[in-house]
From Swiss-Prot:
Residues 1-140, 156-184, 251-286, 408-615 are annotated as: Disordered. Residues 13-26, 63-72, 79-97, 516-548, 562-576, 587-596 have a biased composition (Low complexity). This is Serine/threonine-protein kinase MST20. It catalyses: L-seryl-[protein] + ATP = O-phospho-L-seryl-[protein] + ADP + H(+); L-threonyl-[protein] + ATP = O-phospho-L-threonyl-[protein] + ADP + H(+). Residues 634-885 form the Protein kinase domain. Residues 122-136, 271-280 have a biased composition (Basic and acidic residues). The gene is MST20. It comes from Pyricularia oryzae (strain 70-15 / ATCC MYA-4617 / FGSC 8958) (Rice blast fungus). Residues 1-12, 175-184, 577-586 have a biased composition (Polar residues). Residues 156-166 have a biased composition (Basic residues). One of its GO terms (biological process) is cellular response to hydrogen peroxide. Keywords: ATP-binding, Cytoplasm, Kinase, Nucleotide-binding, Nucleus, Pheromone response, Serine/threonine-protein kinase, Transferase. InterPro entries: CRIB_dom, CRIB_dom_sf, Kinase-like_dom_sf, PAK3-like, PAK_BD, Prot_kinase_dom, Protein_kinase_ATP_BS, Ser/Thr_kinase_AS. Its EC number is 2.7.11.1. It comes from the Eukaryota.
Length: 914
């Protein structure tokens, strides 16, 4: 060959030099990789030079290499093959007639060859110049490789289909180079076991042997022992290659598998000259071999094992089949609620999605875990409280027994719908009178107007809070003072039957409380937070109730809503506090619920939260609380309510003799201590003439004392229940309420529970907002909220339908409260809570019974306040500029209404024999 062939040994990067005998002269040639021939002429020239230079002398030289002889038991020694020797010239792949990379095979002379045969595949390959070039180059590239690793190279220049066993080495001139056959690459390494000594011997022999003349094409191989049959062509993948008779097929097959394993380890992807298939199939085949080798070596990668679900929770999915007009996947409880709600089939078909949202909202706001039930603000707290205390026991002369009676109604049995119960429990829905223990009967406390029947599930919710009654003792007050007047504490049995409805009407309205509860239900952590909030709300409601009861507005016991809200709460003041607490709790719970849900554990979140947050909360409280003992600053404590974590009292400030409301809480019983801090901070920042103001707070002996302004007149509920108000008086109440809301909204606070129960009056007619338990804070980043809180009957449509809402929810509630002042009760109060929610969601703006008797200005005021679309609804600032505000009267005109309400309640109480 004219070109140099450079071969790289697998184990050595150095170039090997071969000394090959030549008929003319010896020359050491450095074999370098031959560049692909550019013309067919070069191939032709190479073939001619091979024919002319290969002679018997070269073969004799090969036979004289005694150093390469092997013992009978030793594997055949490996010798370097000529650059054109077939890669398969090994025991398994004896060289068959090799072909040159020319366009047509060269026929050897008859004197030089005994026989020569080309297989059809070989001939086909010869006919393809590109393929010949490729095969020729690869063949050259592998000859040296095999010279080092094959034990013997048997060149069978002939034997195609005839399988003739003729030894090509027996001829003086072997035509090995005349025709180069291609072999399956899988046979590259087939041969005897690897022999390192043979390789070294071969290297020495090559150095000692003479080289061929320039241009000669070496094709020498080791001599075959006498008697050894010349191996025949063998190919696994091509009919052109035949199996040697010298080796059994089984042994060859075994060796072939070993060779394939070695090939698989080679990173090279080149195609060898002995491949009989197209390059592409060859690559695919090698890839398959590599994959198989790697899978056997590394093993099949393990697939991730997915276990079965642990602790699965079934979540009900309710759908609606428009074809049949029926709900799908409706739980039995929901079916019962729908059937008992009074929602007709026609209504269901018209608004199926709304019904689903309303039911979900109702369930979320009414169902709570057992923990929450225990925390329900004033539910069984009353039993522990003595009902005997007389009005005289009350420190404030303004507080009459009848005032306390209203509180009893508030205690109305838990039979009231869930919503009412929520109000009872911890909400200050009826701040005027905290709910008495259900056991006590208070006929006088029965509300004058009927309330809707409580939902079946709601009654169960009323959980006794009696265990908390002992907490009140923390104030060291005489039982008489602790207890409200007998009327106040007497559990209204009658009120139980009547109050359930009444309470539901007002207390049920306390959906907020329920809402807070549902949130807690959803998450134990939330539940714990809600419980704390309820306790706080209960206390706040108790204060409000106490204030209302003392002012006489509590006498409004007839108002069925208040009794319901108060049922869960203890005394009136308790109810007030409890409400704020409940409301606050609900609101705070919702706000805190989000952050606190994580920290609070499920069943015992309270304890854990206390343990984890106790020290931090106490430290924070010490920073914001005043030093000193409240018992030394205030005197004449009178208990007016009971909450889950403490009681609500009235007291007089020493020196000034100012009457205040005191909320006492046992920190150890507070599941969410951080909520307390939030409530105190909100109250401190909400100082306004139309907001019940925060006076001071003390941390004493593990108990937190919160001192607030006390409103003797009680809540607006008593006023609207026992009196008919003029538009001027209604306008005055709306104005004062709007001023308080404007202040809250300016600070990014949403009250979320505006209703008559949370509007307190003084004996002079001053009006202030209370019960901030459900307050929520919004900011630029979060100007909408989605938590469901508030009282069902006063709720805005966007809240009922579980949509985002903002400050405008308070405006809607104000409009409903205006209707309440007109009609004595809010719309849908006689409906079950679920149906009320349904009507709010579907009817939008409620219809006023005697709208014709209202002035156009008043109707226009309500028109803007009760817009279903919150974007079109007026703001507090807008309504304060409405013409309706021109009808406002002096607040002193409200004083007679407050006194009349107190008297009416006292008379009602007397009629009941209490």
């Amino acid at each position: 060959m004219d070109g140099h062939s450079n071969f790289t040994q697998p184990s050595d990067t150095s170039h090997a030099s071969h000394t090959i005998p030549s008929s003319s002269s010896s020359q050491r040639r450095r074999l370098t990789k031959k560049p692909p021939p550019s013309t067919s002429a070069r191939h032709h020239h190479s073939s001619l030079s091979i024919d002319s230079r290969v002679d018997a002398q070269s073969l004799v030289g090969k036979r004289s290499s005694t150093s390469l002889r092997r013992a009978p038991s030793a594997p055949p020694a490996r010798t370097p093959t000529s650059t054109h020797a077939s890669n398969s010239s090994s025991p398994r792949n004896p060289s068959s007639s090799t072909r040159l990379n020319n366009h047509s095979p060269i026929i050897p002379a008859a004197s030089e060859f005994a026989a020569s045969s080309l297989s059809p595949s070989a001939r086909d390959r010869d006919s393809d110049p590109a393929r010949n070039d490729h095969g020729h180059q690869l063949q050259n590239n592998n000859n040296y490789y095999y010279s080092a690793f094959t034990n013997a190279h048997h060149h069978n220049q002939y034997s195609a289909a005839s399988h003739r066993r003729s030894n090509s080495y027996g001829h003086p001139h072997g035509p090995q180079s005349s025709n180069s056959l291609t072999f399956n690459h899988s046979e590259d390494f087939i041969g005897a076991p690897f022999d390192g000594s043979a390789i070294l011997n071969r290297i020495e022999a090559t150095k000692a042997s003479p080289t061929l003349g320039s241009g000669a094409f070496p094709h020498i191989s080791n001599p075959i022992p006498v008697g050894a049959a010349a191996p025949a062509q063998y190919s696994r993948g091509s009919p052109a290659l035949e199996q040697s008779f010298t080796f059994p097929s089984a042994a060859m097959s075994e060796k072939s598998q070993q060779v394939r394993g070695m090939e698989a380890q080679l990173p090279t992807s080149k195609r060898y000259s002995d491949e009989t298939k197209e390059p592409k199939p060859g690559v695919l085949r090698k890839k398959s071999g590599f994959s198989g080798f790697m899978s056997g070596l590394v093993g099949t990668p393990k697939k991730p094992l997915i276990s079965a679900p642990e602790n699965p929770v079934h979540v009900t999915h309710v759908g609606y089949d428009s074809a049949t007009g029926q709900f799908t996947g409706l739980p039995k409880e929901w079916q019962r609620l729908i059937s008992e709600s009074g929602i007709t089939e026609k209504e269901r078909r018209e608004n199926p999605e709304t019904l689903v949202n309303v039911i979900k909202f109702y369930k979320e706001t009414t169902e709570k875990p057992a923990e929450d039930q225990v925390l329900e603000k004033f539910h069984d707290a009353r039993p522990g409280l003595p009902s005997a205390p007389s009005a005289g026991s009350m420190i404030s002369p303004g507080l009459a027994p009848h005032h306390y009676n209203p509180m009893s109604p508030m205690i109305s049995p838990p039979a009231s719908p869930r919503f009412p119960q929520v109000g009872h429990e911890g909400n200050f829905e009826n701040p005027r009178s905290p709910p008495p223990v259900p056991k006590n009967k208070d006929v006088t406390l029965m509300p004058s107007r009927p309330a809707p029947r409580p939902p079946v599930s709601l009654p169960t919710r009323t959980a006794p809070h009696a265990p908390y009654a002992a907490k009140d003792s923390g104030i060291d007050m005489p039982p008489q003072h602790d207890d409200l007047t007998p009327t106040t504490y007497q559990p209204p049995k009658e009120s139980q039957p009547i109050l359930p409805e009444e309470h539901r009407s007002r207390s049920n309205s306390r959906v907020n409380g329920n809402t807070a509860y549902p949130a807690s239900q959803q998450s134990p952590a939330v539940q714990a937070a809600y419980q704390q909030q309820l306790m706080q709300q209960q206390q706040e409601q108790a204060l409000a109730q106490a204030q209302a009861s003392m002012s006489g507005s509590m006498s409004r016991a007839p108002s069925k809503r208040q009794p319901q809200a108060q049922q869960p709460t203890p005394p009136q003041s308790q109810h007030q506090y409890s409400r704020p607490t409940d409301a606050n709790g609900a609101q705070q719970t919702q706000r805190p619920q989000q952050p606190q849900i994580g920290p609070v554990p499920q069943s015992r979140p309270r304890h854990r939260s206390r343990q984890s947050n106790g020290l931090d909360v106490v430290a924070a409280l010490k920073r914001i609380c005043s030093e000193g003992d409240p018992r030394e600053i205030y005197r004449s404590f009178t208990k007016i309510g009971q909450g889950a974590s403490g009681g609500v009292y009235t007291g007089h400030e020493r020196g000034s003799n100012r009457l205040v409301a005191i909320k006492q809480m046992n920190l150890e019983q507070q599941p969410k201590k951080d909520l307390i801090i939030n409530e105190i901070l909100v109250m401190k920042d909400s100082s306004h003439p139309n907001i019940v103001n925060f006076i001071d707070s003390y941390l004493c002996g593990g108990e937190l004392w919160v001192v607030m302004e006390f409103m003797e007149g009680g809540s607006l509920t008593d006023v609207v229940t026992f009196n008919i108000m003029t538009e001027g008086q209604i306008a005055s109440v709306c104005r004062e309420t709007l001023l308080g809301l404007q202040h809250l909204h300016s600070k990014g606070v949403i009250h979320r529970d505006i209703k008559s129960d949370n509007i307190l009056l003084s004996m002079e007619g001053n009006i202030k907002l209370t019960d901030f338990g459900f307050c929520a804070t919004i900011n630029e980043a979060q100007n909408k909220r989605t938590t469901m809180v508030g009282t069902p009957y006063w709720m805005a449509p966007e809240v009922v339908t579980r949509k985002e809402y903002g400050r405008k929810v308070d405006i809607w509630s104000l409009g409903i409260m205006a209707i309440e002042m007109i009609e004595g009760e809010p719309p849908y109060l006689t409906e079950s809570p679920l149906r009320a929610l349904w009507l709010i969601a579907t009817n939008g703006t409620p219809q006023i019974k005697d709208e014709g008797n209202m002035s156009p200005v008043f109707r226009d005021f309500l028109y803007f306040a009760l817009k279903v679309d919150p974007d079109k609804r007026a703001s507090a600032h807008d309504l304060l500029r409405h013409e309706f505000m021109n009808l406002c009267v002096d607040l002193s005109h409200l004083s007679p209404l407050v006194r009349a309400a107190r008297e009416a309640r006292a008379q009602e109480k007397a009629r009941k024999g209490q």
